[in-house]
Design a protein with these regions (language model features):
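Conserved, well-structured ligand/cofactor-binding cores
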Residues: 4-121
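Single conserved hydrophobic/aromatic residue that forms the stacking wall/gate
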Residues: 120-129
């Protein structure tokens, strides 16, 4: 799923894939293809999505993980990893991994996909899930 390559002499990237195809994403960033495309095609203005909104999404993801664990819909180790990742977002430790501008398509899909890709990419690498 992920291939790494060196671009130029400064940046290493990995290939991320989605329904549109593949795109290079910096290896040190916890976002996927959708976020990288949004950065490329919606580079409008200077204002980023506010941290308060990102933290709100993380609170919802954390609550969902707690409820799903309680209802035995996900394993405790997965729930614990989602909770840990969510807490890091809530505490602002990973703000640099949410690079999107406020000007998007109107539905907020890019911001939600950024949050989803963050969890997807950090769980196996940081939390050994």
């Amino acid at each position: 799923m992920t291939n790494f390559e060196k671009v130029g002499t400064f940046m290493k990237t990995r290939k991320e894939y989605d329904s549109i195809g593949k795109i290079n994403v910096p290896v040190d960033k916890y976002w996927g293809a959708s976020t990288q495309r949004s950065k490329k095609f919606f580079d409008i203005g200077e204002f980023l999505v506010r941290p308060r909104l990102i933290k709100s999404i993380a609170i919802i993801k954390k609550a969902a993980a707690i409820v799903h664990r309680k209802e035995k819909q996900i394993k405790p180790r997965i729930s614990n990893a989602i909770i840990k990742a969510s807490n890091e977002v809530i505490n602002g430790k990973l703000d640099d991994h949410f690079p999107l501008k406020v000007w998007q398509t109107g539905s907020g899909t890019q911001t939600n996909m950024n949050a989803v890709s963050y969890t997807h990419l950090t769980l196996p690498t940081i939390y050994s899930v």
